[in-house]
Amino acid sequence: MGSQWTKDNVYRKAMRDGYRARSAYKLIDINERFNVIRQTDNVVDLGAAPGSWLQVLKTMTEGQLCGVDLNPIIPLENVITITGDFTDPAIQAKIREAMPLVNVVVCDASPHLSGAKAYDQARVMGLNEEALNFASNLLKQGGNLVMKSFQGSDFNELLALVKEKFYSVRVIRSTATRRGSTECYIVAKNFIGDADDDRKKRE
């Protein structure tokens, strides 16, 4: 899928292919290029509604999937869905109970943007840090993280935090991202983890 595709073209293709949103192709593109999700991985999807990434994940892994969002997610067979804010400790406890072993965390979440560039960028960075902290507390050693972000102020500081926790970190643009957008994805592989955390070392 070339970058010359318009938003309407990709939207129509998503509808034809049965995906709930055009963002499905972003995860397909990322996994084809970086092999983030393996056949038996258990995956948590943060900001999962309407569920297009969960639809794609079902084709990539036979492992358990869990989608979390502030908005209800239309159910998918054999997929756990949790409605709530993943930054809320009570919701995090529910996720841990449902998913005791997690290989991959994906996050396509983005705050509602106001149009005030500095304010919006600060909120994006805050959400990214929350997702990174969540992944760090849940992933097993060697696990992977895919997280949407936007390049701007404080992005390099965020990237430095990710590099402290993963052995391999790349910043990429999906071929499905609209031309001119500052949207990017952080693809972080091989979570360093905590050598003293036996739960994270389990296969």
Curated annotation (Swiss-Prot):
The EC number on file is 2.1.1.166
Show the GO MF annotations.
Answer: rRNA (uridine-2'-O-)-methyltransferase activity
Localization terms from the record: Cytoplasm
What InterPro entries does the database record attribute to this sequence?
Answer: RNA_methyltr_RlmE, RNA_MeTrfase_FtsJ_dom, rRNA-MeTfrase_E, SAM-dependent_MTases_sf
Major localisation: cytoplasm
> Is S-adenosyl-L-methionine there in the keyword field?
yes
For this chain, the family text in UniProt reads:
Belongs to the class I-like SAM-binding methyltransferase superfamily. RNA methyltransferase RlmE family.
Functional description taken from the UniProt entry: Specifically methylates the uridine in position 2552 of 23S rRNA at the 2'-O position of the ribose in the fully assembled 50S ribosomal subunit.
The name under which this protein is listed is Ribosomal RNA large subunit methyltransferase E
Protein species of origin: Methanocorpusculum labreanum (strain ATCC 43576 / DSM 4855 / Z)
